[in-house]
């Protein structure tokens, strides 16, 4: 378990060598799934003060779906639409790197602190995107940081649009009137 938290911390510190390590370690998939689940739980509980109990399960589910859409579309766009000449990637290895890049999202749990929710959400989001750029650059063997950043940000925005739509539908169905963010 100690190795798990060290890896998550290294991802949050933007340690590029971590992504090589995670790509090579096929046994890290369980750890990667736990990182993403903890991210989803942090989002859910970090927004609890604004969404209540009705929001917890929905927030976890929507966050996990949003993360998957972000990671998978980034993989498809990076490998199929805009590869560099050296780009080769294994889908599972790529998903592991993107999972660890979501570790800064654990900070969203601090959204429970009154008045900090919005700032924490924005700060953690930016940090996650930067970590994902490092992960994408390593996982897809990109030489260009700009290419990795452009693909990561565009796919992240697509994921945000999907998540926003899902939140609107879910919270409308359960009568949650406050924004979770």
Mark where each language-model region is.
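Loop-to-transmembrane-helix entry motif
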Residues: 22-29, 97-102, 143
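Selected alpha-helical membrane-embedding segments in polytopic membrane proteins
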Residues: 1-89
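Short helix-capping/hinge motifs at transmembrane helix termini and TM-loop junctions
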Residues: 50-51, 82-83, 112-116, 141, ...
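Juxtamembrane boundary at the C-terminal end of a transmembrane helix
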Residues: 161-181
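Selective recognition of hydrophobic, aromatic-rich stretches within alpha-helical transmembrane segments
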Residues: 54-77, 92, 101-161
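Membrane-interface alpha-helices at helix entry/exit sites of multi-pass transporters
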Residues: 29-33, 90-96, 147-150
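Residue-level signal for alpha-helical transmembrane segments in multi-pass membrane proteins
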Residues: 42-49, 131-134, 169, 173
